[in-house]
UniProtKB/Swiss-Prot annotation:
Keywords: Bacteriocin immunity, Plasmid. This is Colicin-E1 immunity protein. Transmembrane segments: none annotated. This protein is able to protect a cell, which harbors the plasmid ColE1 encoding colicin E1, against colicin E1. It comes from Escherichia coli. InterPro entries: Microcin. One of its GO terms (biological process) is bacteriocin immunity. GO terms for molecular function: toxic substance binding. It comes from the Bacteria.
Amino acid sequence: MSLRYYIKNILFGLYCTLIYIYLITKNSEGYYFLVSDKMLYAIVISTILCPYSKYAIEYIAFNFIKKDFFERRKNLNNAPVAKLNLFMLYNLLCLVLAIPFGLLGLFISIKNN
């Protein structure tokens, strides 16, 4: 995994972390929000490991998908809204599963280099 790939894929995790911190600091109306040190630590660790999680999921998925899969299915780009929603769901899944899959991605990255 290159530094460019890491920086490109850490942006989604940083965005979610900044939203969480913003919601903690703007909690003046008395709404209960998950404010704890352990939750903040988990979110920061997930942010750091999110690119590794994405790398591990892509590595595993591309071992099962053939190279010509996207060339043969030209109609995959006909539904841009559905494609965008699926992409956001994929990024959220990578962030939620960042700790276990991130450690796996870190192991795969070290093994391949």
